[in-house]
């Protein structure tokens, strides 16, 4: 993720669009008519918005239906390794409001917010904080949880009404039933 974040932060909008367009054209040629595009490799407000702009341009130029997900809580950026809660503050207080404003101007469809809740990424309290803020901004919720160990993320997703939960490899049965 670290290398991809660096490359994404350095890329201009044209580069983001062209690289993504090639992938989208290939998927469409193989029969995919709906594609989810996620941000999450910029991890700054500016680069996350750039990724959303690239997706919106692709949506306007290509016949595929695009579902768009803001994944600013994909990983803790290197510059926040010593204090991940500062990054959560950035996501909640700066990124989510900026993304909501962007959505209101550029994206008429549902905008999703996803969080990677896992040891080494975002803990349960951080995930709750981000998802609750996203919901306040009118975003539909998604969560990647319990890939390696159960932190209770699946239960949190159910509690908050997430539309999807991914990974769930280590999710206990009682949390799946929630």
Question: What label would you give each PLM region?
Answer:
Residues 140-141, 150-178:
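Active-site-adjacent C-terminal substructures of enzyme catalytic domains
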């Amino acid at each position: 993720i670290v290398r991809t974040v660096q490359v994404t932060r350095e890329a201009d909008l044209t580069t983001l669009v062209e690289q993504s367009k090639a992938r989208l054209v290939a998927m469409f040629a193989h029969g995919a008519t709906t594609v989810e595009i996620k941000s999450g490799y910029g991890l700054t407000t500016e680069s996350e918005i750039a990724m959303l702009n690239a997706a919106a341009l692709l949506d306007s130029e290509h016949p595929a239906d695009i579902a768009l997900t803001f994944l600013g809580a994909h990983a803790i950026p290197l510059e926040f390794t010593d204090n991940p809660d500062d990054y959560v503050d950035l996501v909640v207080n700066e990124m989510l409001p900026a993304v909501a404003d962007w959505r209101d101007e550029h994206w008429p469809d549902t905008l999703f917010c996803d969080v990677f809740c896992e040891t080494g990424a975002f803990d349960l309290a951080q995930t709750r904080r981000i998802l609750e803020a996203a919901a306040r901004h009118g975003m539909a919720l998604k969560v990647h949880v319990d890939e390696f160990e159960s932190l209770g993320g699946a239960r949190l997703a159910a509690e908050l009404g997430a539309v999807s939960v991914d990974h769930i490899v280590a999710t206990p049965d009682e949390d799946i039933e929630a």
